[in-house]
Amino acid sequence: MFWRGENFSLEKLPADRSRVIYAPEPHKPIDDIDAAIRHSLLNPIEMDPLPALLFPGMKLTIAFDDISLPLPKMTRPDIRQRIIEAVLDMAAEAGVDDVHIIAALALHRRMTEDELRHQLGDRVYDAFAPRGLLYQHDAEDPDALALLGTTDHGEEVEINKRAAESDLLVYVNINLVAMDGGWKSTATGLASYRSLRHHHNTHTMQNSRSFMDAHKSELHKSNWRMGEIMRKHGPKIFQIETNINNDTFPDPFAFLSKREWEWNGRDRAKFVATQAALKRTPNRIARNIFHGIEAPHNMTSIQCGEVEAVHKVTTENVWKQQLVEVQGQTDILTMGIPFICPYNVNSIMNPILVMCTGLGYFFNLYRGKPLVREGGVVIMTHPTPNEFHPVHHPSYIDFFEQVLTETTVPHD
């Protein structure tokens, strides 16, 4: 089965020359998530328990990953809500009343009220948003940024001013892939454009050999250099990282998570009926259907404390859930591109994002070598309509129509 945007298809491949790679089975989630959260906050890695870091009169800032994770969105309550509520309860017990909550957007689009409520829950939103204490990071507002220093590579480290001036910065992360978390949480999510330009560029992409292996990724090397500046000159950071399983689709889409030979009669009927219905459905409605999916994936581990020590555990857990061993590269790699990527949640998968998802994310989902050999062929399936969201992706339109018509050379 191949994804084709807001639809899918069954294709025949040469039986004697094809290898089909399937994701591992979802790991079992934690039974008592709230108890696991509390235990982790009280037993962090290489740091004091969270209550010992809280005191009256302090500035406490809680930052969290935006809607680019997880994909699709999680069934409520989102684990960010559960973690932030636990942190707030401990802060209240310690007499902390100067608390800000910040969505770590980097340069992503701003979230809507409904999206924030889905992530944080009504209790947190109603308590903080009306008073201006829940807001979204602005990477281009000079009055809301603070320069912490410069790395030995000449990279300015400039982050959210409130976070920089806090006595404690608590970061709440979700990890689906090894690319996320660690210093990338704060050094990217709360960074200014002046900082982001050092690692979100074509040089970084062309000189990285996998974004899923930090040792081969220029993106991670830059973020870790910035992390050293933050460690020396920034706020104390209490990193909270979580792993979730890959239980992605609920009924009536559960057949999408199965291998084709595992389909029973009901699954095959659902596939045929869904595919036929989607062919008759306008793109806008089909898009709304898929983006309305709430995934049953849930938390399999939580670890808190010092950034690098925490991330080491998180990464090991990611690999346990996600790694598939493949022997040898292939001549031709086929990839079905689905309806969603980190940059089009509740939005349109425009032609640029199709390329970004396939050649950026999917191609780089490896640790050792790429699945396809150098000089090989990549075939992606997606209808790729000339369609853009004018509010979410306005700059993409000019880039697509004015720049890519003149050159496709990255350094140009």
Residue ranges of each PLM-predicted region?
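N-terminal amphipathic/basic leader segments beginning at the initiator methionine
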Residues: M1-R38
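Glycine-rich phosphate/diphosphate-binding loops that line cofactor/substrate pockets in enzymes
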Residues: I45-D66, E93-V96, E325-Q329, L371-R373
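Short glycine-rich or small-residue beta-strand-to-loop segments that form or flank ligand, phosphate
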Residues: K59-M74, H100-L107, Y171
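Histidine-anchored nucleotide/phosphate-binding helix
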Residues: L71-G95, A191, G358-L371
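Well-ordered mid-protein domain cores that form the structural environment of catalytic cofactors
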Residues: P77-E156
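Acidic, Ser/Thr-rich peripheral helices and adjacent loops at domain boundaries
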Residues: R117-G132, E260-D267, H389-D412
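Conserved, well-structured core segments that form the ligand-binding/active-site neighborhood
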Residues: D126-Q329, G336-F339, L359-N364, P370-V372
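C-terminal catalytic subdomain
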Residues: S347, L353-D412
